[in-house]
């Protein structure tokens, strides 16, 4: 049995198959203006997750149409806080002809963190840390055997 996640996405995004998870899609256009750091033109990821986690009871990944950052990093594609059961994926850097593929990978990656998986050293594994879009494009949308085994142990 696959683990379950809820994905809350802007209404412009169509539901996508997230191969490693049973996925419930909800559509909500979230006002990002109060998350935006005007000096950077980016949303601070940890503050976004904290704000959106209110009332979350099961693993939930929010998809936001903005660019995200975390203190000490120029940008992040997403951030998960397992204790809050909440993650966020930012779409700004995923644009292009591979947008849907990239979005699936980033949702899967952050959902993996929500279930307790760490970053993986295997560059083909979806849990590999992406420093760039090239890293995201190279990796698959699937867990490697080691991460799949770790997830099975966690579940």
Swiss-Prot record:
Coiled-coil boundaries: none
Keyword Hydrolase: yes
Binding, Zn(2+) 2: 120, 125, 144, 147
InterPro entries, per the entry: MetalloPept_cat_dom_sf, Pept_M54_archaemetzincn, Pept_M54_archaemetzncn_arc/bac
Entries under Gene3D superfamilies matching the protein: Collagenase (Catalytic Domain) (3.40.390.10)
GO biological process, any: proteolysis
EC number(s) from the headed UniProt entry: 3.4.-.-
Cofactors that this protein relies on: Zn(2+)
Keyword terms: Hydrolase, Metal-binding, Metalloprotease, Protease, Zinc
A single GO molecular function term of this UniProt record: metallopeptidase activity
Binding site for Zn(2+) 1: 109, 113, 119
Bound cofactor: record note: Binds 2 Zn(2+) ions per subunit. One is catalytic, whereas the other seems to have a structural role.
Enzyme class (EC, first level): hydrolase
Active site: 110
UniProt cross-references to CDD domains, sorted A to Z: Peptidase_M54 (cd11375)
Entry-linked HAMAP family: Archaemetzincin
NCBIfam families (alphabetical): archmetzin
Family per record: Belongs to the peptidase M54 family.
Subunit structure: Monomer.
Role description: Probable zinc metalloprotease whose natural substrate is unknown.
Protein name: Archaemetzincin
Species this protein is from: Pyrobaculum aerophilum (strain ATCC 51768 / DSM 7523 / JCM 9630 / CIP 104966 / NBRC 100827 / IM2)
């Amino acid at each position: 049995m696959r683990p379950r996640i809820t994905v809350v996405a802007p209404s412009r995004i169509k539901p996508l198959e997230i191969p490693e998870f049973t996925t419930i899609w909800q559509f909500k256009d979230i006002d990002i203006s109060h998350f935006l750091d005007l000096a950077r033109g980016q949303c601070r990821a940890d503050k976004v997750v904290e704000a959106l986690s209110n009332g979350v009871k099961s693993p939930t990944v929010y998809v936001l149409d903005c660019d995200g950052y975390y203190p000490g990093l120029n940008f992040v594609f997403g951030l998960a806080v397992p204790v809050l059961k909440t993650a966020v994926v930012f779409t700004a850097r995923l644009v292009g002809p591979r947008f849907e593929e990239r979005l699936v990978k980033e949702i899967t990656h952050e959902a993996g963190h929500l279930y307790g998986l760490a970053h993986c050293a295997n560059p083909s594994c979806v849990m590999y840390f992406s420093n760039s879009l090239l890293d995201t494009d190279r990796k698959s949308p699937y867990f490697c055997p080691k991460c799949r085994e770790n997830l099975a142990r966690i579940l």
